[in-house]
């Protein structure tokens, strides 16, 4: 199972939401949690083998936990942690409790593993957002023109048609989105990419901004959920950049003390897809 979140219950107990591979999402009761040996193992973003007592009605119970992985790479970085928390919340919102979904469980685990390894957390989140849309009952066509079915053209998106239009058929929707065709090309790639085939990611910051705009509009139009975790990562755009600059400045100062070469701060951040 993967621990999604926990909250205090009464004075010393906790309710722990766990996404299990076999039984879906369930709420578990942990008595005297702060004094329990399980306390360190029921933190959010914990992956483990769990022995669980699952009741048909009411709360279930954790009997034992083994083989714990706590995603240290994620937990030690505010930005990765924020995005990982968002995809946990997105997975939680996408299916009903007690609804087994081994495919979603595996997809969530793969996303977290790659994020923990240091792959681009923003793009991994974008891929997760695109591929989880089907769990919300949303099926978008970003691969071929909705009218003539041609592929590989500078498409634009039509909210009315739920898909893309080629230049010859832009006139089918006067209120088309006017999105960057390269962003739509990437969204099409994201919709079909398999993590087993993903080795590196390379997308520049300007395109990441375009992708974020497109996905926000898609979720506002077709999904309509407003998660606290999403609001938090949106706020990273303002004060988070200050933290990044301070961190980079600290690294650059240390680097300059060993060399008289140029500063590295001007380099753009990107990885390769």
Indicate residue ranges for each PLM-predicted region.
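Non-catalytic alpha-helical scaffolds and adjoining flexible linkers that form interface surfaces
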Residues: 1-14, 19-255, 265, 272-273
């Amino acid at each position: 199972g993967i621990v999604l979140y926990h909250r205090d219950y009464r004075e010393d107990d906790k309710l722990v939401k766990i996404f299990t591979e076999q039984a879906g999402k369930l709420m578990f009761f942990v008595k005297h949690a702060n004094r329990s040996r399980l306390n360190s193992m029921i933190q959010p973003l914990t992956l483990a083998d769990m022995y669980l007592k699952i009741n048909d009605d009411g709360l279930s119970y954790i009997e034992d936990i083994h083989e714990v992985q706590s995603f240290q790479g994620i937990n030690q970085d505010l930005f990765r942690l924020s995005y990982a928390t968002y995809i946990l919340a997105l997975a939680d919102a996408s299916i009903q409790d007690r609804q087994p979904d081994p495919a979603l469980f595996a997809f969530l685990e793969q996303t977290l593993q790659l994020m923990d390894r240091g792959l681009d957390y923003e793009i991994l989140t974008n891929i997760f957002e695109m591929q989880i849309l089907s769990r919300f009952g949303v099926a978008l066509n970003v691969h071929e023109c909705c009218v003539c079915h041609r592929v590989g053209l500078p498409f634009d998106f039509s909210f009315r048609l739920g898909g893309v239009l080629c230049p010859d058929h832009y006139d089918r929707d006067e209120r088309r989105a006017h999105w960057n065709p390269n962003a739509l090309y990437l969204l099409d790639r994201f919709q079909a990419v398999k993590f087993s085939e993903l080795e590196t990611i390379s997308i520049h910051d300007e395109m990441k901004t375009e992708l974020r705009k497109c996905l926000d509009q898609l979720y506002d139009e077709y999904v309509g959920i407003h998660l606290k975790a999403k609001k938090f990562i949106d706020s990273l755009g303002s004060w988070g950049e200050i933290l990044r600059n301070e961190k980079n400045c600290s690294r650059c100062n240390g680097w300059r003390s060993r060399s008289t070469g140029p500063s590295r701060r001007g380099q753009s951040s990107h990885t390769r897809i």
